[in-house]
């Protein structure tokens, strides 16, 4: 039997575009895991995905599992037979499980005794017998948040299924998957090519679908076509298309046969802030905006249609007619909003709840205003501008534009603030208060914006924890994890002199008596320190490095970061492993000590050369390193401490810590405590593995 190509295609109704790629990738990963678990040798597993299909193609799939030797050890001979040599129930039960009698079992002799043994050669199952269950399992494990049923069947999937094709080479594998019997039928494009046709061999896929069905099933190829054609179309009109990856992925998932076209809109709409126009084009219509070389929006857009038309101009005109009312709405909202000052929207915030136990957006605004001013004072930002930005921070939520185009919150506040003549750093802060919105997003660009962004996020963290609604499992309705990480990123990357403890205390204080959770401050600080775990692990730091720093609970993020970098560098030193082990030993010794230690090491009680030498080093370093610790020069401090390795090793080799003489014993324990205190000024090195 030779290796063959395997094909599975699931033909469906239109799949969710934002989930299409992840569904296909998960399908491929699941089937690969199934094949590997079954011991089926195979080549590359390729995935294909289009709006109405998911498909996998496995190269060089073996025709059967390899034969394998099975060994099962049974009871020991003394437990397998009674005094009369009759098989015990334990032996008979084991034999039944193996499909033999006790008399048919072999015996295994070792240095430790003799046991019953079953050996057999199991013939591998044929691949076509195994595949249907593997496909069913792979589909059942797909990350589908909401399943649906169709017709009278109880079968559930992300969308109704119409065709299933399982081919191993040219052989159709009989199976019923998701309520559909496997067949050779493949469905083509809805309006072009052949509506359906038969496929004879797995190797024909996806080319036969491209040629006869007018469907480009290769997701990567389809995406590349759209990208190349859109770039060419933009260049033709002297522009550059905004091919942001998320929209490009979504558009790729919406079409089977991509055709790129260019359209225009009236230049008068360019008077509206570009963000509102782009929101409409990208969010509502799935169009690609076009910019000139200077980054200014052009009165053009590029879109992708799913059909080759004999009259493409008709399709272009249709899309222009669709987008025009949306742009006209944006123009109307922009003009009407500017008839009143941004600040005039402040009273209307009283009508909107932030959270039922925490009050209105107006109350939140007052807290943000106060906290932004407090933060600004700590970081050296303009306090007046920060409090002004805090006062205006949520006013744009009451504008017509943001009500209709919700994703323009913040940016419209900036435009309206500029129109009202507010200071530029105040206007920019209104736009940047929500940054960073996601991993890798830009941070606020000026100190006032940093103060406002921190204040907004900390107010939410303090309030939600203050009423006991912290995130649980995957549920995080107020995006507190993102808020915490955002605050940490701003403080660390901008090197701001803020302490999480005092920052949280101030945020909680501004709520007055509204908060019922007396532990809110500690819980928020611990939660935020916990977010460092995700951050530093993504940067490649080991878990034990993080635990070593967390053990000291440093609450100033910039200080936390300096400690992390110091410990990570320390681990690269040749002395690190020995000193980490020594710290662990010291920690264990001190944990078992029951006698109170001295405030300082008594030189007169030092008897051995090794303890005298170690005490001399520890005393000298205690004095030398204090400026290092005070200035946060933790890396330099650990480099100095690394020089203690030889003295520490010699101490443990030559000195009996638990001496019989009480005063000597306590003095030696005190010396070890002083040694450990030096390292603990940076991190708990004993936790390093």
From Swiss-Prot:
Q: EC number(s) for this protein?
A: 6.1.1.14
Q: Which InterPro entries match?
A: DALR_anticod-bd, Gly-tRNA-synth_bsu, Gly-tRNA-synth_heterodimer
Coiled-coil ranges from the UniProt annotation: none
Q: Name one GO biological process term.
A: arginyl-tRNA aminoacylation
Q: Where in the cell is it found?
A: Cytoplasm
UniProt-recorded Gene Ontology molecular function terms: arginine-tRNA ligase activity; ATP binding; glycine-tRNA ligase activity
Q: Which reaction does it catalyse?
A: tRNA(Gly) + glycine + ATP = glycyl-tRNA(Gly) + AMP + diphosphate
List UniProt keywords, sorted A-Z: Aminoacyl-tRNA synthetase, ATP-binding, Cytoplasm, Ligase, Nucleotide-binding, Protein biosynthesis
Q: Name one Pfam family in it.
A: DALR_1
Question: What's any one GO cellular component for it?
Answer: cytosol
Instruction: State the superkingdom.
Output: Bacteria
User: Belongs to which family?
Assistant: Belongs to the class-II aminoacyl-tRNA synthetase family.
Subunit composition and interactions: Tetramer of two alpha and two beta subunits.
In terms of HAMAP family, this protein maps to:
Gly_tRNA_synth_beta
Q: Which NCBIfam families match?
A: glyS
- UniProt name for this protein: Glycine--tRNA ligase beta subunit
Native organism is Erwinia tasmaniensis (strain DSM 17950 / CFBP 7177 / CIP 109463 / NCPPB 4357 / Et1/99)
Organism lineage: Bacteria, Pseudomonadati, Pseudomonadota, Gammaproteobacteria, Enterobacterales
């Amino acid at each position: 039997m030779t290796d063959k190509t395997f094909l599975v295609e699931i033909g469906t109704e239109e799949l969710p575009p934002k989930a299409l790629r992840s569904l296909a990738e998960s399908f491929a990963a699941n089937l690969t895991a199934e094949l590997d678990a079954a011991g089926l040798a195979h080549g590359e597993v390729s995935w294909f995905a289009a709006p109405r299909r998911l498909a996998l193609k496995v190269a060089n799939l073996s025709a059967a599992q390899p034969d394998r030797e099975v060994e099962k050890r049974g009871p020991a001979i003394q437990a397998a037979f009674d005094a009369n040599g009759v098989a015990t129930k334990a032996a008979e039960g084991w034999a039944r499980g193996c499909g033999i009698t006790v008399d048919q079992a072999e015996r295994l002799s070792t240095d430790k005794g003799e046991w019953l043994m079953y050996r057999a050669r199991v013939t591998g199952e044929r691949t076509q017998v195994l595949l249907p269950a593997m496909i069913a399992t792979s589909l059942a494990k797909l990350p589908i948040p909401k399943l649906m049923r169709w017709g009278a069947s109880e079968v559930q999937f992300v969308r109704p299924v119409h065709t299933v094709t399982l081919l191993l080479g040219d052989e159709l594998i009989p199976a019923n998957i998701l309520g559909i019997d496997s067949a050779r039928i493949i469905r083509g494009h809805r309006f072009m090519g052949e509506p359906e046709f038969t496929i004879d061999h797995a190797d024909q896929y996806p080319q036969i679908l491209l040629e006869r069905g007018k469907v480009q099933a290769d997701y990567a190829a389809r995406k590349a076509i759209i990208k190349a054609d859109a770039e060419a179309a933009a260049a033709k009109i002297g522009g550059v298309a905004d091919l942001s990856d998320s929209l490009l992925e979504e558009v790729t998932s919406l079409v089977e046969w991509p055709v790129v076209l260019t359209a225009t809109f009236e230049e008068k709409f360019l008077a509206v802030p570009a963000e509102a126009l782009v929101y409409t084009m990208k969010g509502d219509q799935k169009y690609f905006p076009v910019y000139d070389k200077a980054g200014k929006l052009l009165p053009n857009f590029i879109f992708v249609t799913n059909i080759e038309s004999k009259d493409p101009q008709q399709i272009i005109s249709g899309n222009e007619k669709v987008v025009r009312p949306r742009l006209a709405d944006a123009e109307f909202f922009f003009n009407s909003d500017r008839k009143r000052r941004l600040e005039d929207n402040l009273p209307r915030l009283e009508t909107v709840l932030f959270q039922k136990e925490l009050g209105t957006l107006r109350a939140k605004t007052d807290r943000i205003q106060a906290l932004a001013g407090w933060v600004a004072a700590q970081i050296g930002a303009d306090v007046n501008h920060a409090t002004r930005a805090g006062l205006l921070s949520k006013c744009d939520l009451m504008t017509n534009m943001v009500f209709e185009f919700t994703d323009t919150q913040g940016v419209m506040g900036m435009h309206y603030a500029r129109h009202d003549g507010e200071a530029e750093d105040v206007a920019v802060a209104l736009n940047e208060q929500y940054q960073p919105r996601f991993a890798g997003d830009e941070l606020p660009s000026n100190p006032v914006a940093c103060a406002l962004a921190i204040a907004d996020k900390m107010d939410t963290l303090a309030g939600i924890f203050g009423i006991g609604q912290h995130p649980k499992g995957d549920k995080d309705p107020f995006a507190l994890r993102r808020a915490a990480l955002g605050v940490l990123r701003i403080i660390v990357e901008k090197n701001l002199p803020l302490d999480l403890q005092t920052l949280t205390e101030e945020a909680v204080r501004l709520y007055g008596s509204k908060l019922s959770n007396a532990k809110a401050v500690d819980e928020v600080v611990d939660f935020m320190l916990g977010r460092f775990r995700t951050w530093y692990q993504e940067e490649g730091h080991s878990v034990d490095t993080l635990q070593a720093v967390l053990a000291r609970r440093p609450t100033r993020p910039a200080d936390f970061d300096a400690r992390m970098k110091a410990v990570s560098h320390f681990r690269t030193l040749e002395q690190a492993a020995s000193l980490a082990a020594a710290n662990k030993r010291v920690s264990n010794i001190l944990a078992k000590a029951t006698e109170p230690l001295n405030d300082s090491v008594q030189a007169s009680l030092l008897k051995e050369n090794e303890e005298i030498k170690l005490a001399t080093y520890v005393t000298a370093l205690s004095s030398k390193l204090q400026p290092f610790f005070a200035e946060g020069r933790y890396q330099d401090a650990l480099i100095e401490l690394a020089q203690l390795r030889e003295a520490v090793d010699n101490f443990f080799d030559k000195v009996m810590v638990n001496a019989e003489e009480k005063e000597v014993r306590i003095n030696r324990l005190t010396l070890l405590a002083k040694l450990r205190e030096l390292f603990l000024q940076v991190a708990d090195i004993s936790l390093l593995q």
